[in-house]
Amino acid sequence: MEEINPWSSQPLVDVEKLFTDFGIETIENVLPMIPEVPSFMRRRIVIGHRDYQQIAGCISDKRPFHVLTGFMPSGHPHLGHLMVMKEVVWHVQQGGSGYVAIADREAHAVRGISWEKCDEFGKEYLACLCALGFEGKTYFQSRNNRLKDLAFEAATKVNFSELTAIYGFGADTELAHAESVITQVADILFPQVDSGPAPTVVPVGVDQDPHIRLARGIAHKMRMFTIEEREGYISVRSKNAPEAALNAVKSAFPHAKKYEGHVDIKGGTCTEVAARVREIERAHGGFAFYTPSSTYHIFMPGLTGGKMSSSIPESTISFHESDPVVRKKVMNGITGGRMTLEEQKRLGGEPDRCSLYL
C-alpha cells in the first residue's frame, strides 16, 4: 500500500494509488452537483475528494457548512499555498463559514521553528488570505485553549499503534510530534465545536490525506450514536450515550421502540432522524460531529524538484520576494534540458523533469 508522509518535501505520492488504496474519489463525479464549477476543479487542479457530495449539496441548497484549512508557518508563504487559499475563499463565497488555522504547534514540534518565527510567518499567511478576500475566523493553535481541550478529548479516541500505522511513527518519534497530529485533528473538528455541527470541507494537498483519515475516524468515535437504515425501519444505536439521551430519542419519534442500547424508528427518513438525533446528542453534552469532507489538489512543483516547500526556500517563489530575487531563482531552476547540445538536438528536452514547464 502507498505510504504518505505529510511532512516530506518530495511529491512521491502515486495519485492513482490514492484512489485505489485509500478510497479517494475523483472530483468529476461531483461536478454536476455544483451550480458554478470553479476553474480549479474544471481544470483538474483539484483532482479528488472524500464525501464532497454533502458540501456540494449544501452549496446547491444554500444550507450551512464550514470550510477549514491550516498552514504550517515554517517559512514565508509562497505560490504553492495560493491554490488552497483560493479554495477556502471560494467556499466562503459559496456560503461557507470560513476557518483558517496557523499550525504553529506543528511547525515548532516538527520543524523546530521558534515561536517568534511562527508568529512572524503566521501573520504573513493571514495577510495573504486577507488580500485574496478571505472573510472568516483565524487562530494560532498555541493560543486557542478551546482547541487544546478538543485535542485532549480527541486523543482519548486514538492510540499510538494507530498513529504508527497511519504515519509510520516509531520508538524515536517525539511526543510533541504525535501531539501536533492530534491538534490537527482538533483543527478539522473545531468549526463544529465553535459554530455548531455542520458538514465541513478541508481543502488540502494530496499528501495531507493521513490527517483527514484520522480525523474522520475520530469524529465517528466521538459520536454518542450510530444511525443505521434497516429494512422497514431506522435503528439509532448507542455507542456511549447516557440513558437519558436514549430515552430522549425514543420520545422524539411517535412510532419508536426502545430496546437495550438502541431505539428502532418506523417512519421518517434517515436524514430527518439523523438531524433530530444530533440535536439530542448536543443537548446531552455530545459533539454530534458530521464526518468531515475533503478536497485534494495537485502539488505545485518546486524550482529545485520535489514540491514547492517553505522548508526549502530555494524551491519557492515567495510573495515577499523582489523581482530580481525571483528572476535569479527561476533562471537557476531545474529544467528538462539534456547534458549536451548534441543530446538536446537529437533527443529533445524532458518536459516532465522541468520545474518551469510544469
Locate the predicted segments by residue.
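N-terminal Rossmann-like or analogous alpha/beta NTP/dinucleotide-binding catalytic cores
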Residues: 1-66, 73-191
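Conserved phosphate-binding loops in nucleotide/dinucleotide-binding enzymes
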Residues: 116-118, 141, 202-205, 295, ...
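Residue-level signal for inorganic ion chemistry
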Residues: 88, 305, 357
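Short, solvent-exposed beta-strand edge segments and adjacent coil->beta transition regions
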Residues: 74, 197-201, 314
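Short alpha-helical patches at coil-to-helix transitions and adjacent helical residues
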Residues: 81, 85, 208-212, 354
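Non-catalytic terminal extensions that flank enzyme cores
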Residues: 1-72, 220, 228-315, 319-323, ...
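Divalent-metal (Mg2+/Mn2+/Ca2+)-assisted nucleotide/phosphate chemistry catalytic cores
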Residues: 116-288
